[in-house]
């Protein structure tokens, strides 16, 4: 069986915690897109683990697979694996041979392009980790894949063309000096580094044909959880373009990015992860955005700082047009609503129920950023709820939530016509109300 976990908003919804929550029923956790630009935090055995690439299930002894839809920075991968081993874990990680590899010049180009965009006030706010440039090389059919690392002759030929082309862009288009990048455009240095990566991948038997590997695990009766990074409104096709990531976090890509067929993924559950309010890192419209004391309160209570970048996140009220769009684009069979505890003790909790633009009421996300930027939120207000003990609520169940918090949850369920499987009532894995396990 498969369960696909998808962020319903702009990332940072708490996907890793939900993956961890159902980890006991899972045998394999698969990342099907993205790279080391999407941090996730998992708490297990009283220990906190912050990961940006390795699938979160490995901290509970599950197999973690980075699918062909991912872009992999081997340096980050091995740093995270080694750090987990130093803490007494034995992570079982597999890499799709078809996944593309982030190389040093990708990171340099990422920073150069963002700097150029800053001059025209059109920067995206990337993490600078080379994700976009690597996907560009994938789509341009010139990138290096994990399988290429294992073929020394093919690797050298590919690098000869690729590095020369990228150096020309870095210097002639962006006006930077490649010689000042500590070897990021040095073919010999990159080739040697890639061969070292290949030796470790080969020695630890990490590379697999991911689709075949996962199909065999499912045939053997194993449960597979497919984990998207970022969120629906950051999807390259369905998100707030151009303020998006360079891949597809939406559920449809779970098949493409893992090598499993769409009927295999579609027969399983698709769970949308929702933060009880909204947060965003980087640029782009945000109609329900807050500032001042309320924003600061939510930011501090929710710890709204990027796992990877440490940047303060922008925060706002829950945006229902965004969630309706996500529910349609992904086909959620269930949802999880996290961080209900963060909103406790506010006198009033608001929701962006709809938008208004040019006198028209809009209930879903506009297709263009320009139209979205012109939207004003139509707010719906809820009475706030008192603080509660997360452990008590998690133990007693849904009925122990304050009545006003229940009304808030039931409003979201009704608007999306989707049941809430999980309610996050505190920061820990155990501080959750589980109403339905998608694997059962």
UniProtKB/Swiss-Prot annotation:
Substrate binds at residues 307-313. Pathway: Purine metabolism; AMP biosynthesis via de novo pathway; AMP from IMP: step 1/2. GO terms for cellular component: cytoplasm. Transmembrane segments: none annotated. It is found in: Cytoplasm. Keywords: Cytoplasm, GTP-binding, Ligase, Magnesium, Metal-binding, Nucleotide-binding, Purine biosynthesis. Its EC number is 6.3.4.4. Coiled coil: none annotated. Its cofactor is Mg(2+). The active site is at 12 (proton acceptor), 40 (proton donor). GO terms for biological process: 'de novo' AMP biosynthetic process; IMP metabolic process. It is an enzyme of class 6 (ligase). Its main location: cytoplasm. One of its GO terms (molecular function) is GTP binding. Gene3D superfamilies: Adenylosuccinate Synthetase, subunit A, domain 1, Adenylosuccinate Synthetase, subunit A, domain 2, Adenylosuccinate Synthetase, subunit A, domain 3. Mg(2+) binds at residues 12, 39. IMP binds at residues 12-15, 37-40, 127, 141, 230, 245, 311. Binds 1 Mg(2+) ion per subunit. Homodimer. Plays an important role in the de novo pathway of purine nucleotide biosynthesis. Catalyzes the first committed step in the biosynthesis of AMP from IMP. Belongs to the adenylosuccinate synthetase family. This is Adenylosuccinate synthetase. It comes from Halobacterium salinarum (strain ATCC 700922 / JCM 11081 / NRC-1). The gene is purA.
